[in-house]
A protein has these predicted regions:
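Short, small-residue-biased leader/transition segments that mark boundaries at the very start
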Residues: 1-5
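Catalytic Walker B motif of ABC-type/P-loop ATPase nucleotide-binding domains
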Residues: 248-251
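A short, proline-enriched helix->beta-strand linker immediately N-terminal to the Walker B motif
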Residues: 242-246
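Conserved ABC transporter NBD signature motif
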Residues: 145-153
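Helix-to-loop junction immediately C-terminal to a conserved catalytic motif
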Residues: 137
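Conserved ABC ATPase signature
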Residues: 223-227, 231-233
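Short coil-to-helix segment of the ABC ATPase nucleotide-binding domain corresponding to the Q-loop/switch region
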Residues: 182-190
Length: 316
């Protein structure tokens, strides 16, 4: 048996072992933790990525222009939303108790985000950016106002419906949350099995597609610790794209990356948005926003407002 494995690619060895062992533990872990999405992004590539200039102030900012889609609709729609933070699981308290005991984070939120838009959320640490993202993917319960995400009414959402919502959303974590003892291919394979994919050839085809999107098609056999920080973040993005999301949520995705690698991640997000997937990214990196301008929402003193890039630094 060992001779057979020596003649096979490393990812294929892991794939065969997974089929034999079923690996229910990892499937359950991935399903509960990530539950990525099914609708939205078409196959594409990122090409001709240019290195950053040594002096970014001599460059003309490349303002992002969202793709205008026929039948454009709101992927996110918030009206009069107030967000309270609690450490209790979703749905474990009544709305009345949450209003009494939860910590007020943000109030009177009103905005729409459409398919194909790339939107920055910016503000100081603790200003509520992550709390908003957690509300959008139903880690925090919405108890005041109206909120619709990827076709789901957050006020009426039941706990059993959360996995269905998250299959329409791709989530990119700053701390990666990869399976460190499985290679790139198997990290993606477990997600697909956990979210209902059955056909093995379709699974392999989709994994090949998303690895090509993030320029990791030659790294399928690598273990996460063999990848650079930027490559690990690209793997996380590939994982979020597996189920073709309508919405991609990224919480400080460039926080642990060097400036050049961070710019590559922003260009990748912009390319994903051009294919019709709404991308919402929280960050405190104002230099990136100046270099790659796009719609920006500022968080300050429990409120939000849209700001032009030119006045953003004065308000933070």
């Amino acid at each position: 048996a060992s001779d057979v494995y020596k003649r096979q690619p490393l990812w294929k060895v892991g794939y065969d072992r997974c089929k034999k062992q079923k690996s229910l533990f990892y499937s359950a872990f991935i399903f509960i933790t990530f539950a990525p999405v099914r609708i939205g992004v078409r196959r594409h590539e990122t090409k001709n990525i240019r290195p950053a200039s040594a002096d970014r102030h001599t460059r003309t900012p490349r303002t992002f222009q969202p793709t205008r889609l026929m039948g454009e609709q709101n992927v996110i729609r918030l009206r009069g939303v107030t967000i309270y933070h609690t450490d209790d699981p979703f749905g474990s308290r009544s709305e009345k108790k949450l209003l009494q005991q939860g910590e007020l984070i943000l109030s009177d939120l009103n905005f729409d985000i459409n398919a194909g838009e790339f939107v920055y959320l910016i503000g100081r640490v603790g200003s509520g950016k992550s709390s908003l993202l957690k509300t959008l993917y139903a880690e925090l319960q919405l108890i005041e106002g109206e909120g619709y995400v990827a076709g789901f009414d957050l006020r009426k959402l039941k706990r059993r419906e959360i996995p269905m919502l998250r299959r329409r959303i791709g989530i990119v974590f700053q701390d990666y949350q990869l399976l460190t003892d499985r290679n790139v291919f198997m990290n993606l394979y477990y997600v697909m099995k956990a979210t209902g994919w059955k056909n093995e050839s379709e699974i392999r085809k989709r994994i090949d597609e998303v690895l090509k999107v993030v320029s990791l098609e030659a790294k399928g056999y690598k273990i996460p610790f063999e990848l650079s920080g930027g490559e690990q973040q690209r793997l996380v993005i590939a994982r979020a794209l597996l189920n073709r999301p309508r919405l991609l949520l990224a919480d400080e995705p460039t926080g642990n990356l060097d400036p050049l690698t961070a710019e590559g991640i922003i260009r990748l997000f912009q390319e994903i948005a051009r294919q019709g997937c709404a991308v919402v990214m929280s960050t405190h990196n104002t230099a990136l926003i100046e270099e790659y301008p796009s719609r920006t929402i500022l968080f300050s003193k429990g409120k939000i407002k849209e700001v032009p890039v030119q006045t953003m630094l004065q308000d933070i």
